[in-house]
């Protein structure tokens, strides 16, 4: 089994290669051994809100899936990182791309998020074998569950994505 490293960073961008406008994790409240809690405030100016739907804007469901995926990526980078020297600011630095989405097992929408809403994103690691990680996620808006899912992420050689 490969050596795994734990990393703790002050900036969300140090965990993920995503950058605005597609970085959907605004802040991280906590990281434990098998879970992460993060937040996102729905920005009325974001590219995916302006056209979904003019005059009655709601956050697209695909963005909620992506929020949980990014939170899962944070957990992998934080606790299950096979790289001691991890740098998300240079796209060619890391030998592996961590937390690449390979499967959405299920997703269930139970409500809407609108511009200005602050979303709580909770993702828990259910299992992992090697570089394959199974998660479930919950997103809440005003303490109401609006999305839940199960998904799988994996680590791939970085050159696969080039």
Language model features: what each stretch is:
Residues 2-6, 73-120, 146, 153:
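Hydrophobic beta-strand-centered segment that forms part of the acyl-chain substrate-binding groove
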